[in-house]
Amino acid sequence: MEAVLPSRCNREDVPGKARAERFVSGFPSVCEQKTEQEKLSGVVKRVHLDLRKKYRKAGDFEKIWLEHCKDDGRLCEYAVAMKALADNHWAKKCEGEGRIEWCLGVCQEYFFNGGKKKALEKDAKRDALNKLQSSSHAEAGVSDFGVPSIKPLNDEYMTGKIRLLDVGSCYNPFLKYEDFLAVGIDIVPAVETVFKCDFLNLQIQRPLQLAPDAIDAFLKQLSSPIDYLPTELFHVIVFSLLLSYFPSPYQRWICCKKAHELLTLNGLLLIITPDSSHQNRHAVMMKSWKIAIESLGFRRMTYSKFSHMHLMAFRKTSLKTTSDLLTRNYPDMLYIPQDFNYDGEEDHFSPCCARSELEDEQLACGFTELPDTPYDSDSGESHNSTMPFYEFEDPILLLT
């Protein structure tokens, strides 16, 4: 970087002819870069809009999704556009892949710096308190309950590599990190290191009764396409800008349910979803997501809101995937603002229509914002400021 800065600072000293030669020799102008980015972004946006329009018109998300997965030409165009945006525009614009670094930071703190131990100790204290409260209703003669001692905590720290599944991976950005045994999947991979897999229709099988080394060997011999995986296989599953891709809340629900089945006990589900609104604009929506995802057997461990996205980490707290769909319609609680847009609000888009600056930044910086400090959902403090994060109660969401 030091070799580049002087040339940038002395830019005006370079004769006009020399500057022109630099652009001709492979350095596109700002205008050319913007035009290319608008074209690539248009490809991505049209796919999202068309999926939502088809879902609103037909209502059969399974049929629409199967047809979408068969459209190889359009999916390949989408994958190429996403890869080009990530490589040539987003990373350069914001000088790094913040979403990846955030995931790395969460995993480092949880698996290697004592975060998992603290969470397990907190669970033990919570269980002890619940037992004490329940014992208060027992007969007076039963008085030897006491405060249960916290059991020794095994499996507090990672001893091997973190087995990570990146869903909708595109180009498997976690593969280069030695701490991870990363498996990237996508419906149409952009690179050979990502396996072809339709996560919505992935078949879940019984868990592998194998030693950790043997499980690692199993993952290393995977090949495309992946049609099935055993339960309790991964320590971390990443949904980065994934859930908003789907037009139906129920599809997002299926993804979270499958993630719970594929995670080991106390494994992490990391969810990153775009949102350029201010701090509390969609607080009710995030409260809704929290309730829905925790109903599956998760507990939210970390939350952060930055200018262009929400970042959440959920910990699997029960082996059994549980959810009472009779009491609440949990799938519909995984909504996004686009679910309520009318078709007329989106028909203005055309291939020759430039994206707004806000839309550019939402996608660009969705990959790049970094957290400042950890956030515990019990503390009520957000990452990016000292301002408390208030999860507003919505009577509609809290009805039983």
From Swiss-Prot:
Known EC number: 2.1.1.-
GO BP terms, alphabetized: cellular response to amino acid starvation; methylation; negative regulation of TORC1 signaling; regulation of TORC1 signaling
Annotated positions binding S-adenosyl-L-methionine: R99, G168, D186, D198, F199, S240
Domain of life per record: Eukaryota
Primary enzyme class: transferase
Pfam families reported in the protein's UniProt record: Bmt2
Entry-linked InterPro entries: Bmt2/SAMTOR (IPR021867), SAM-dependent_MTases_sf (IPR029063)
GO molecular function: methyltransferase activity; S-adenosyl-L-methionine binding
Any coiled-coil regions, as ranges: none
Keywords: Methyltransferase, S-adenosyl-L-methionine, Transferase
Assembly information from the UniProt record: Interacts with the GATOR1 complex; interaction is disrupted when samtor binds S-adenosyl-L-methionine. Interacts with the KICSTOR complex; interaction is disrupted when samtor binds S-adenosyl-L-methionine.
Entry function: S-adenosyl-L-methionine-binding protein that acts as an inhibitor of mTORC1 signaling via interaction with the GATOR1 and KICSTOR complexes. Acts as a sensor of S-adenosyl-L-methionine to signal methionine sufficiency to mTORC1: in presence of methionine, binds S-adenosyl-L-methionine, leading to disrupt interaction with the GATOR1 and KICSTOR complexes and promote mTORC1 signaling. Upon methionine starvation, S-adenosyl-L-methionine levels are reduced, thereby promoting the association with GATOR1 and KICSTOR, leading to inhibit mTORC1 signaling.
Family: Belongs to the BMT2/SAMTOR family.
Protein name: S-adenosylmethionine sensor upstream of mTORC1
The species this protein was found in: Xenopus laevis (African clawed frog)
Classification lineage: Eukaryota, Metazoa, Chordata, Craniata, Vertebrata
Gene: samtor
